[in-house]
Amino acid sequence: MRSRSRSRSRQRERRRSDSRARSRSERRTYQKPQHRRSVSRERKRERDRELHRERTSNRSSRRSREKDAVPRRRRTRSSPSRSSSSSSSDRSSSSRSPSRSRKSRPKSVERWPNDRYHENNDRRQNPFRGRAPEGSFINDPAEPSFRSQHRGRGSSNHQFKGDSKAVNARRNQRVLIGEEGVPEVWGKSPSRPETDDVELVKGSYIGPKKKKKKGKRKHKKSEKKSKKKSKKSKKKKSKQESSSSSSSSSSEDSSDESSSSSSSSSSDSEDESEEEDVWLEKTADGIKKPKKKKSSTSKKDKKSKKKKKKRKSEAEKSKKSSSSSASKSKNKESASHNDEDVGPSLRPGGSLNQKDFGKALLPGEGAAMAAYIAEGKRIPRRGEIGLTSDEIANFESVGYVMSGSRHRRMEAVRIRKENQLYSADEKRALAMFSKEERQKRENKILSQFKDMIHSKLQAKDKK
């Protein structure tokens, strides 16, 4: 970076010297003689000295800016424009205002008024030009940035010499924070109560959450049961009150015997309704009509009792008939289930085609299959080679199955090969039979051939 900046500064100096020579020649040719006379050699020397000092100050300011700036491309592009503008401003200022203070900075070329070039390029104020806002931790004096260290190569340390007290204070503050913490920002975690009574064994630990849930569930169930019981007790009390009121009214009207019978019947009906199913209770409730004030005559009481008895008998009959019909239907269903075979129905017309049969027996297969049959074991299929028959049977009992089409073809081959097997005696008998048949055929052919030759010889002799 230093070599680049030096080369650029040399190029700028050359340009400036060229521009000075041109400006002097132009002044000599185009400027008026009055102006030439006013400018003396001493003033020229002063201007040269001022220019030299301004150049040195500009270089130092540029270097400090380059250290602060993050994006390199923008800096490299904007630096020549700045240098050119500063050089032109130097010329204009040197030509126009010779009496200027040495420390005053030269003004740049006037730009378009709405152009915010300088505002955007002021890197110390703009956080988006590589410099973070002043309050952030990036500009912390205790944390010098990597780029400033890298570019300065030790020269950036002079920035923090004045702030050494602040840096030390910040360091001490960090140490305190690390030791004590910040309770205002991050509170301490709650201390766990030490339980010495519980001794945990490996694999026997059950989380406390599950126990809590179970306890909650039990508590809820007990609450629900208690609520249900309270509701039932309330209902019973209300029914008893109604029955007592009805019995008292009937006792006032009717005789003592009739009142006792009505109260007993009402209590019996309540017990029956509680024992019976829900739908019977509903029917009984539906049958009951809204209570009206009974007349003083005993005839109406007797009629109402008779009606109640009839309705009870009808309800009992309907219940019995429904239960009998349900039991009959259940018996029918069980009988039908017993008659039908459980499981998938067999395919109708599952005749075997030529595709289902394999090829003929290979040499040695017949003998092997005969040995399996003699031992009473199942014959393995070609897809099961490498496994013993016991292993295959175990696999099939567990549930391992071949693919359907392969299974069908293998079964067909197995059946055909089992049918092809013969015992040793049968083989001998077959061999003898085939030999006899062959000899008969051969003898027949030979006799026919002999007869033909004999007939031909006799025909020649006759001639």
UniProtKB/Swiss-Prot annotation:
Name used for this protein in its record: NF-kappa-B-activating protein
Function: Tumor suppressor involved in maintaining genome integrity. Influences gene expression and mRNA splicing.
Ranges of compositional bias, category Acidic residues: 268-278
Mutant lacking the gene: phenotype: Late embryonic to early larval lethal. RNAi-mediated knockdown in the wing imaginal discs causes a developmental delay of 1 to 2 days and results in viable adults with small crumpled wings possessing extra vein tissue. Larval imaginal discs show tissue overgrowth with loss of tissue architecture and formation of multilayered epithelia, characteristics of tumorigenesis; cells show increased invasiveness, loss of polarity, increased levels of R-loop-associated genome instability and increased levels of c-Jun N-terminal kinase-induced apoptosis.
Compositionally biased spans, kind Basic residues: 1-14, 208-238, 289-312
Phosphothreonine PTM sites in chain numbering: 195
GO annotation, biological process: mRNA splicing, via spliceosome; regulation of gene expression
Pfam families noted in UniProt: Nkap_C
Gene source species: Drosophila melanogaster (Fruit fly)
Keyword Nucleus on entry: yes
Keywords: Nucleus, Phosphoprotein, Tumor suppressor
Biased composition annotated in UniProt, kind: Low complexity: 78-98, 241-267
Compositional bias (Basic and acidic residues): 15-29, 39-71, 107-125, 279-288, 330-340
Cellular component terms per the entry's GO annotation: catalytic step 2 spliceosome; nucleus
Phosphoserine modifications at: 136, 189, 191
Main location: nucleus
